[in-house]
Structure formats: C-alpha cells, structure tokens
Amino acid sequence: MLLVQQVDQAVHSVSVISYILYLFFNHCQKMKLLLYPHGGSGNHGCEAIVRSTLKMIPTATLFSSNPDEDKRYGLDAICTLRAAQAPMSHLSLAYWKAFIRYRFGDKEAFDRTSFRSIFQEANSDSYALSIGGDNYCYGVPVFIYLVNKQLRKQGIKTILWGCSVEPEVLKGDILNDLRSYTHIFARESITYEAMKEKGIQQLSLFPDPAFQLNRTDLTLPEGFAEGNTVGINVSPMIIKHEKAKGMTLLNYRQLIRYIIATTDMQIALIPHVVWNYNDDRIPLQFLYNEFKGTGRVVLIEDHNAEELKGFISRCRFLVASRTHASIAAYSTQIPTLVMGYSVKARGIARDLFGNEEHYVLPVQSLQQGNDLLKAFQWLQTHEDEIRKHYRTFMPGYLAKTFQAGQLLQTL
C-alpha cells in the first residue's frame, strides 16, 4: 500500500510539473517577440543568441541587418525574418511624410521611417528584446536609442537581453536609455553590480542564453583527434586592442609551437565571426599557412553556430578570443582560456570560477611572446580540477538560463 501511495504521489508530481510547463509554453506561444538589433549570423555569437532565445520563447520575428545572411545559416527555419531597415523611394508617401516632419524640425524623421517595419509589427502584446549583448560597448548606439524611444512611445515593453556593459560607460545618454528599459537581463556579475550601483532597479542576473545552444556533431575533418585537440580561435578584434604591434599573433605562434613540440595533441583553428570587416579566418589562415606542413593543424571551415559548437565540444582545450566560442566550450565542459579585452570575458569567467585569474588573459596585458603559453600551461596543469568543477557546477548554472525565459513571460 505504501508503495502504491508513493507511486501515486510521483505521478501527481509529474502531472503538476507537466501542467506548469504546459501553461508556460502555451503563454510563450501567445507572446509576440520582436528581436533587434541583429547584425547577421556571420557573427555566430549573434546567431547563437537568437537560436538559444527561441528555445525559451519559440515564436519570434527577427529584425536583421542582413536577412540573406541569416537564411544562409538556417534562421529562416526557426523564426520570421524581416529586414530591420526598409528602403524608401523618393516617390513614396513614407518619404514625403518624413520629409515634411523633417522640415518642421523632426531631425529623426527619416531614420525613424527607415525602421518602420519594427514599429509597424509591434503591438500591445509585443515584447521587444534588444539582443546584441554588447551593443552598448562600442560607441554611442544612436539607432538603438531611436528604436527604443519609438517603441516606448507606442507602449511596447523593451527588454535588454543577455547584456554586458563596461562600467565606465554607464553615464549620460547610455545610462538614461538603460534606465528606460522595462527590464534588463545582465549576463555576468560585473555588469549587474555596476548597474545596481547606478540605481537601475529593473535588473536581473542570468547566464547568457547561448549557454543553452544546441550542438550538431558533423564528421570531424582529418587531423582532428576527438578529445585530444586544442581548439584555437583568434579574432581581429583582439589584435586591434593589443598594446604592442604583432604581440597577439606572436603569442599564438609560440603556443602552437609548444603544443606541437611537447604534446601529442592536434590543433583545430576555429573561426566564429566571418564578416568581411571582422573575419576570424584572416588571422587563422595566417597561422595555418605557417604550420600546415606539420600535419598537426587543421583549419575548420565556416559553419552555423550549432555546428561550430559541435567541433568545439570535441576539443580537449579551447583558447579563444570570441565570447560565444568560449561559451560553447564552457557549456560542454571544455577547459578554456580566453584571450579577452572587455568586461564580458572577465565577468563570465568570474561567475563560473569565482575569479577570472588564469581563465582570462587580457590582450592589453601581453608584454612577452610567451605570456599566452604560460597561461595555457596553467590550464594544462589544472585540467582535472577544472573538469571536476564543471561536473558539479555547470548543471545548475545551465538551468538558470531557462529561468530567464520564465521571468520574461511574467513582465
């Protein structure tokens, strides 16, 4: 009889949980989610945020600066794609309305009209998620201000989703815009604490949604040894932030030489952004050309975010400069060293490990050609310790990402 009662209680508990999940996802289906701004999936970190967000809130319209690029990586299969800015003929009624408003002193009239597809899509059931992650870290985001201002004027809830912001920029127009969001989801504690200090109240701390990105395991290329390959990612962005010219690539070259000379590990060069003006394949191709004759180095071609995560997850270590390459590794419990330059790398590592020391090497700090090598040697020495920490810590951390989706539907 006792066993029967226990079974009945278990069945009842499962039924209650199933019903709660049904209510949550049924509500999510009714939500009208507008995702903006999105520069295109050639930045696979941007793509990863979109894909992971749609695991939580499955129905959305993505307003993209490059819808054709998003189609190339398959986003049209999981969401509605719209161009963020619509062309405007000089013969159109929209143009002449904007022209008249401009002549009467509305200096934003033309810009606002170019983004009209977003404003026309929005209604009282809409949630507008600003998804760039670090859009407030690269100068004054004037077009984000403009879109936010108009959406708020229409009574639309605006959400800053999975963000990092350098503490020193929290002032003036940026701070005013941040204070006007319905809610802000900070993705790491440095940003969260800095915003709290500035009096921002509508604020939560959750992991970057991309920690929940699915992985797709393609056939590994020849030269990629599963479980015994060091993944390497280099970006033009970190090279721009180096203090001594050439120091970044010198450090990567020294690291590769060390791996080839002293270990039996292979090396996979993995791009994560392939935009023409910011293409990881350029520095990676440089490294590949130098070491391809060793037979120890493979250059991974461009793939979508889930496929890239599949390659990263089968590495033994990752040394990366792109945030979402590192997130792909963290979330699959790969010991990772980040060559970083900003708050996002430091903040995420601090939340995962308690501090960023040994896990993030600021590119600005590079002074010697073996700085990266020494940091990697520490990672090697502590490999077992890091993996043990992942096993106990990561399941709970990953679970928090879906809690962000649950909070979103209550706002």
PLM ranges: what are they?
Residues 25, 30-411:
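Active-site anion-handling motifs in enzyme catalytic cores
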